[in-house]
Amino acid sequence: MTVRFYSFLLYLAGVLFVAGLVHIVAILVMPQVATRDAYARLAALAKPGETTLLPRALPGHQVTPYEDPAFAQAVCLYDLTDGPLHVHADLPDNRLVTISFRTRTGQVFYSMTDRASLHGTIDVRIMTQPQLDAIEAAEGDEDNDQPLKELRLVAPDAKGFVLVDAMSTYPSERAGAEAEVKSVACAPETLAQD
Amino acid sequence: MTLIKFLLTALAGIALGFMITTRVLDRRLSFDTAQAGPWRGQPKSGTMDIDPYANARIARTAELPLGSAEGLSFIARNDSAGAPLRPDCDYIVSGGVPPTRYWTLTLISPKGFLIDNKAKRFGFTSAEVVRAADGTFTIVVARTARSGNWLPVGDARAYALMLRLYDTLLDFGTTKVGADALPKITRGGCA
């Protein structure tokens, strides 16, 4: 009786051990194996290297869950393999605009609001570490006194996406918010090779 | 015989492991949890420091958490007394919100989707809300029309409330947040 009981406990421990292992592995590999993640859904709507207005969040017509219906949203998918991406926004209105820079698997590596703009414009260049090194080497020491007019971001991976959000505080501002997110320019650049 | 027992043990373990994983992700559990009254948030999900559970969840649901500089979001599935939100009851969301440029309150399904209603109102922005003289507000969440700030439930059988603070000074990393920092959710009459 006791032998049987202990052998049962042993098998139970085996089940729990395997379950724990499967659980940990499943959690850790989920971002790599998920096929219907945010990037995949956005890639079905948007071409890489240009700003695409996402459809307004309405019941039954949502690209992703937990969207804020008070916001207009645009996306720019990028691939930095061939060169950096230049994001430029003119924000003349006092509207809340937020920009988030995300990796292929959806993590935010940088985010900002229109408050970070300089005289109403935002200039961000996203690049890989080798591209940043190349740009800094090309610039040399000549203009070290000049303050940088752009924000240089090193992306964790070559692929990812930029999400631009503008708030329509009242429903009547929807068209303005949509126009504002659409006007944010997102331009892939090719680095001059020498 | 022993081999079969071993295989069964492994299979049972794998099945249990997947079951636990699904349950944990569906319930949005993670190590990174901030709580204020009925509101729960995951302030690190908008950073590269994201919790592995939140990371697995956003891959699975495709949700796009707010970046840390964009704002903070909170979900309430219970009222301030701790009871789950019932679609046949009225709820009063009232109080104040920490210093923030804008906030929005949205009614969503348990999985985060908007719920259709005849009034076509899915949420309130801080600018739209009609306030009392002292700046506080009252939003009534109810199935049938109310005067003032009415957030319709539609035909939902279950729902949750989502509060988003945009461009906020609130920082969960450095501040302890009390239950009264975010609005109270009080149950009113039930049908």
Show the residue positions of the predicted features.
Chain B
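A compositional/structural signature for long, glycine/proline-rich flexible linkers
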Residues: M1-A191
